[in-house]
Amino acid sequence: MCKRFKFLLAVSALFISITVVLAGCGGSSVPYKKDDTYKDSKDNFITITAENEWRVKGSQNSEANYKVESTEYKGDSHSVVAISVKEKINGSDPLLVVNDYHYYILSPRENGFSLTPIGTSHPNSAQWKEFQEGFKGANDKEEFLKKEVANVNKQNIFKKTN
């Protein structure tokens, strides 16, 4: 009985050790950190309030809090995020999220990140449906995401200010 107890104790300790090591290996997949502030060319300022929450101050006193959710569409460094309005501060929305969600390819940059729009959660969003089909059919997901970013003219580039 004592040998069995020692064996179970050793196996439990090994399992816990492996879990701790693996949990420590996983880094954040987003190219920003909490409390960082970024600015785009339209003078929108994004403050990262949590890994999945942004506060955006735009022109003409527009300000809102957004929820930023990861999706299953990921490559090595590029990923797709769904952005929704959590709270409009002054009754306005600087990112103009019309439907429940707007989908963007989040790409790391040297001094920040970029957001490339790829559709909305509206049921008739042809752009989002085409993206989903193309992604599912792509063998190299990262290469597909890079091509999508290169093919879209409208891209918001945010540079770190602090």
Swiss-Prot record:
It comes from the Bacteria. Coiled coil: none annotated. Residues 1-24 form the signal peptide. A lipid is attached at residue 25 (S-diacylglycerol cysteine). InterPro entries: DUF5512. It is a lipid-anchor. It is found in: Cell membrane. GO terms for cellular component: plasma membrane. Its main location: membrane. This is Uncharacterized protein pXO2-32/BXB0031/GBAA_pXO2_0031. It comes from Bacillus anthracis. The lineage of its organism: Bacteria, Bacillati, Bacillota, Bacilli, Bacillales.
